[in-house]
Each structure stands twice: as structure tokens, then as C-alpha cells.
């Protein structure tokens, strides 16, 4: 049965969707996706994202923008971007969060001392902007959970948000939850070998969890062998993820947890609304 869902993290503004974005959204609506949170990742795309999310879509889905400087795109960021971000947050109350922001030690070039110092500086500056405007954050963290938590405490951000694509331990998940953050789980959870993530999915209270696709990245296991147009994936090819495949994540949770699928869907929707303070109408939208 199709159930109303919110994709709490989808880069629908990415160039990978330029050729068929409207079709992707139509397919998402058909799958039950009533809302999509779109976190920007570089300043050059902020204006276009705001315009895209403001466009009326009578058939859905509702699209909510978040603005931020993603750590993986460190080389693209300018110091003046922080001034622009502050200005846009002041002028655009429809922005639901500061994100995608965070820290990344997975890529070797980002772990170099100078790059790491710049990551931390930009991250904490954006946390400060979020704190000043009492906005939630959408966080990226790879191999740096202790540092992320330390920055949150140092800056004093307590306005909640989502740690997206969570890949840490149960204990780390509980630390984020204690700080008022929700944990976003998506495609990686659906893969059979994801034992650690599945432990997180079953150990945390349902109230701490949200679901996401992170499209075009992190494709779910059921859709990993062929492209959206039905072509089989060839060796070395990457399958573009889609918000229409968000039900794969719901189905995995339903197989792992005792709650009925309908209860899970409603909880994930309500948790996303609460985490990002989305308009209450998000709770009653029909797919």
C-alpha cells in the first residue's frame, strides 16, 4: 500500500536531474512522496534552489530548501559565501534549515591540516548562523563524529535538525539524539550487509529516526542492478538514486522493527516535520 512519505534529504537540484527533473518528481508522487527536503551544497546553486522550491506544484511534491556549504565541496567555497548565506537566511523565511553542512575526514585531501582547519571554521561559522536564527541544521559527518559533537557543544547550537546518512555506532547515534538531533537513514540500510546500521535502526526509539534517499547518491539495494529506464547496470556504472525509491527504506524498516508499516510511515513523516519545523500541513498531505 502506498503511504505518504517525506524524503528528508534529496539533492533534487543536482545536475544529474537536469534532463528529467519533472519526471522524477512525478514518479516520486506516484510512489507516495508528498514532500522533499532539498539541502543545497554550494553557494552558486542557492538562488536557483530557492526559485525551484517556490514554484507552485498543485500535484506535489512540496519542496523545502535548506542552504549550506557542504564540506566535500570545500574548494568551491569562498569566505564571502558566509555573508551571502546570512543575507539569504534573513530574507527567505522559507529556508527550513542550514545545510548541508558538516565535516569530512573520509577523503584524504580533506583531512590535510589546512583543509581540516578550514572545514572546521566554515562549519562552526554556519552553526553560529543557525544558532542566531534559531534554525535546525542538516549535518554531514564521515569519520568525524566526535569532532561534530564537539563543534555543536562549542558553538552551543541547540535548535535540532538531522544528522543525515548516519553511519556511526549506536552509542554515537544516542549522543546525537541527546543533543536534539534526528538520525537520517536511507539506501545503505537496505543493503543486506549493513549489519551495523540495522542495529542502529532497531536500537533507537522510533521518535529519533527519519528516512531519506540522498538522491542522486546512495541507491537502495532493490534498485541497484538497473537504471531508472530499465537498462541493466553495467560493471563500473553508477545507478542514479531517486526520491521515488524512498519506499525501499520504509520497507526495510518494516522488516526490521515491530511497528506496522503504516505506523512507521506516519512516524517518519511526523519526525521530519518536527526535526525541521515544517508547516503542519505536511502531516495531512495526500499522495
Description of each model-found segment:
Residues 1-287:
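Mid-domain alpha/beta scaffold segments of enzyme catalytic cores
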Amino acid at each position: 500500500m502506498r503511504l505518504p512519505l517525506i524524503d528528508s534529504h534529496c539533492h533534487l537540484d543536482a545536475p544529474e536531474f537536469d534532463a528529467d527533473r519533472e519526471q522524477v518528481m512525478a514518479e516520486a508522487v506516484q510512489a507516495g512522496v508528498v514532500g522533499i527536503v532539498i539541502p543545497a551544497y554550494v553557494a552558486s546553486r542557492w538562488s536557483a534552489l530557492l526559485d525551484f522550491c517556490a514554484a507552485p506544484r498543485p500535484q506535489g511534491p512540496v519542496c523545502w530548501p535548506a542552504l549550506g556549504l557542504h564540506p566535500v565541496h570545500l574548494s568551491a567555497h569562498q569566505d564571502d559565501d558566509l555573508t551571502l548565506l546570512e543575507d539569504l537566511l534573513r530574507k527567505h523565511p522559507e529556508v527550513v534549515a542550514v545545510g548541508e553542512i558538516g565535516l569530512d575526514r573520509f577523503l584524504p585531501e580533506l583531512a590535510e591540516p589546512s583543509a581540516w582547519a578550514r572545514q572546521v571554521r566554515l562549519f562552526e561559522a554556519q552553526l553560529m548562523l543557525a544558532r542566531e536564527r534559531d534554525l535546525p541544521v542538516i549535518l554531514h559527518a564521515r569519520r568525524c563524529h566526535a569532532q561534530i559533537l564537539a563543534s555543536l557543544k562549542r558553538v552551543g547550537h541547540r535548535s535540532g535538525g538531522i544528522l543525515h546518512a548516519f553511519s556511526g555506532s549506536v552509542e554515537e547515534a544516542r549522543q546525537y539524539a541527546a543533543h536534539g538531533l534526528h538520525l537520517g537513514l536511507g539506501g545503505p540500510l537496505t543493503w543486506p550487509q549493513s549489519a551495523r546500521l540495522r542495529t542502529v535502526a532497531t536500537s533507537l526509539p522510533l521518535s529519533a529516526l527519519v528516512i531519506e534517499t540522498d538522491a542522486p547518491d546512495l541507491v537502495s539495494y532493490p534498485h541497484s542492478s538497473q537504471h531508472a529506464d530499465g537498462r541493466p547496470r553495467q560493471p563500473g556504472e553508477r545507478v542514479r538514486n531517486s526520491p521515488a525509491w524512498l519506499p525501499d527504506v520504509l520497507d526495510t524498516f518494516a522488516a526490521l522493527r515491530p511497528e506496522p508499516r503504516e505506523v512507521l510511515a506516519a512516524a517518519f513523516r511526523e519526525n521530519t516535520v518536527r526535526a525541521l519545523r515544517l508547516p503542519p500541513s505536511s502531516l495531512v498531505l495526500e499522495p
